[in-house]
Amino acid sequence: MTQTLSQLENSGAFIERHIGPDAAQQQEMLNAVGAQSLNALTGQIVPKDIQLATPPQVGAPATEYAALAELKAIASRNKRFTSYIGMGYTAVQLPPVILRNMLENPGWYTAYTPYQPEVSQGRLEALLNFQQVTLDLTGLDMASASLLDEATAAAEAMAMAKRVSKLKNANRFFVASDVHPQTLDVVRTRAETFGFEVIVDDAQKVLDHQDVFGVLLQQVGTTGEIHDYTALISELKSRKIVVSVAADIMALVLLTAPGKQGADIVFGSAQRFGVPMGYGGPHAAFFAAKDEYKRSMPGRIIGVSKDAAGNTALRMAMQTREQHIRREKANSNICTSQVLLTNIASLYAVYHGPVGLKRIANRIHRLTDILAAGLQQKGLKLRHAHYFDTLCVEVVDKAGVLARAEAAEINLRSDILNAVGITLDETTTRENVMQLFSVLLGDNHGLDIDTLDKDVAHDSRSIQAAMLRDDEILTHPVFNRYHSETEMMRYMHSLERKDLALNQAMIPLGSCTMKLNAAAEMIPITWPEFAELHPFCPPEQAEGYQQMIAQLADWLVKLTGYDAVCMQPNSGAQGEYAGLLAIRHYHESRNEGHRDICLIPASAHGTNPASAHMAGMQVVVVACDKNGNIDLTDLRAKAEQAGDNLSCIMVTYPSTHGVYEETIREVCEVVHQFGGQVYLDGANMNAQVGITSPGFIGADVSHLNLHKTFCIPHGGGGPGMGPIGVKAHLAPFVPGHSVVQIEGMLTRQGAVSAAPFGSASILPISWMYIRMMGAEGLKKASQVAILNANYIASRLQDAFPVLYTGRDGRVAHECILDIRPLKEETGISELDIAKRLIDYGFHAPTMSFPVAGTLMVEPTESESKVELDRFIDAMLAIRAEIDQVKAGVWPLEDNPLVNAPHIQSELVAEWAHPYSREVAVFPAGVADKYWPTVKRLDDVYGDRNLFCSCVPISEYQ
């Protein structure tokens, strides 16, 4: 039959690229699960009363090339002025070797958070290097492997200060008046929910205030002044006040370490180490503290441990501090952080080394000295005598200066009374400085760079002698070896080869949605039109961003059934927090601020109770019935018991048990009946899009994990993005921002992230995904995700019972395999199965969540039937191996499962096991074999012998 031109143009071509199984494979799987079609399968599984009659109107699909051209036209509306605004954001030079071999490499950006250390040694090493950078620059004992941004790190420092404070009756937190305004904004937001009073004053007046448990100082103030706080910190410590210091990572290369001055906590943004501004993110924050406070620290900590053979290996240490274990008692609600950006900063430090970093920092400071000398020579006054890279220049004709700057396509900081701020960076050249002279002094200034350079080189006093660093940094071999591009390329490749990412195999992690991150979606994030904008640039310079964000928000509104979307939260956990704050402030606006009880099902993800606690709520757990559903009787009882104090319920849909609960609307009605709000966790939106929606179901607010459902990659543990959708009555209570007015958002609330639109530069990924898929493709993606999960469940249920099912024995987009009966019979655990899967070339499913002793499998729509069958075959082969143990062929203490994973050296080592080397290392054949580089890690050893800096030199010899 002759095809029409429309058919030949095939605007939906990307749908077939994104969805793994082709039409024939889909039909084979439908036959296997006993369904006629995708629509029939969906109709059986999803409750009829929540099925959408028509799909959301987000437009027709577009080809990759058409979507890229459309987005390029939008991006071109952004104006790339040279930015000297500073305030924690500067232009950078990302080394091309890192750009090409990491940021643009799916071997790095498609990996998951390193919960399975045996398949994560590469990025764990890069993260450990970052911790070493942090330790060297801050002068403290313990560092984490990144937080979300500098402002949220400040809020975490405040919370940590209260946890470790010996002044238990003190409830006030002091913030120096020259911290960045966005930092103060986020601190105030967090303090309100914790019930802390925030005092803002000149740092030298801190001792005038009583009942202070913690202090936040900024080493280089927001307008550029370098502070020597040594004496003040000493006095504060004598009064048992916990001292946190915000620091600039590039300035720390030259300045004395705050830890050496007595600071308890030091944090800051790592953006200057090679990560583009990206209109606000994503960027990683560094965070360090004294050793005595290590168990109170937020975020991931990478530690050195041993594997089963006694070899050095790396792992995430002290996980009992974290939300997935301690729930509402966790130190923080952080789940995914900023691993990809952290590793860019880490490798930036490796590539430049101490000599290169000092050269960059000294060049920035020299150019700042030259600029200062020239301006002062011509009669302009600087507000601060001591500075690193930022000048606060007093000007008489401020409007004229700003007009000349705009004409020259330059952005200066303009919010300082009777002055302008100028922050230089590693991209600044002598030509840029001459241009700044012209803007500030006029074209006939008569200044000469070389003459000024000679003057300042011999007589620079802009950094106090006491503030100059006098110790060596980055002495470890890893920072002193890989300085040629060849060496660097090979080092990065050696790290990548140690890890298992989506470019090698399916990652079937339940509740994580490890779907395709298509190349066409990733390409725009490195376009300079998106990468080079400062988050506080004038809005007329960001019209492309505003258009893209507005379109994406409109699509998300239609897909979620909500009335508005706020893009600020820069992780799922931050989205939860922002959504709960909206609920809290809504109740307060109705004089019902006493409503503080949050109902959470027993099956909930650990971030839910941790976020509720952060939002100042009391957590009350609702039971689940034997089928894994919310127990309506218990829900009614708990809601009635809470009464006028009921704030909300946090519920995930489909549930974390992998089923569409039939009574979800009734759950919403019960909570609304008692005056509460419904927070629907968006973690499982991949089983809703195009089929149903949170707003249609009856929820009031949700966060959306754009790094799950909408294709932003996990990056080995971040970046994430967690925008919130809200019904109209909650829209006035979403996060605002103290520096930038967010267009279309009528809110007076404080910020939850440093930048107004969170990690804005990765939003094009989700824009591209929705644009290329269209309404038709998005619905089909959800349907195939459901089909793939049911196909796995149907083929594995005889070997591994599926713990929870819905109507007709179906599951949603994921399924829980119950390992507990096997463990009772044979002694083989879910951990043994997870590690044995590595030998078969797979990342393990989610272990022991939401039920201990289980494996939760989520295949997503992107995996073909071929890959699904490969996984199923591996699981069935493992079941046969378990039967061998059960039959006594292999002893429980010595078999391929308990000894897994096996490494390459075992092929030639002494062999005394009752199974062959071939069974050990080639259970699935030799083709495309993934080799882990370490055996199973000793978690107990790692936590008992905590070591969180680079391993000794001998390991590199």
UniProtKB/Swiss-Prot annotation:
GO terms for molecular function: glycine binding; glycine dehydrogenase (decarboxylating) activity; pyridoxal phosphate binding. GO terms for biological process: glycine decarboxylation via glycine cleavage system. It is an enzyme of class 1 (oxidoreductase). One of its GO terms (cellular component) is cytosol. Its cofactor is pyridoxal 5'-phosphate. It catalyses: N(6)-[(R)-lipoyl]-L-lysyl-[glycine-cleavage complex H protein] + glycine + H(+) = N(6)-[(R)-S(8)-aminomethyldihydrolipoyl]-L-lysyl-[glycine-cleavage complex H protein] + CO2. The modification N6-(pyridoxal phosphate)lysine is found at K708. It comes from the Bacteria. Its EC number is 1.4.4.2. Belongs to the GcvP family. The glycine cleavage system catalyzes the degradation of glycine. The P protein binds the alpha-amino group of glycine through its pyridoxal phosphate cofactor; CO(2) is released and the remaining methylamine moiety is then transferred to the lipoamide cofactor of the H protein. The glycine cleavage system is composed of four proteins: P, T, L and H. NCBIfam families: gcvP (TIGR00461), PRK04366.1 (NF003346). This is Glycine dehydrogenase (decarboxylating). It comes from Escherichia coli O1:K1 / APEC.
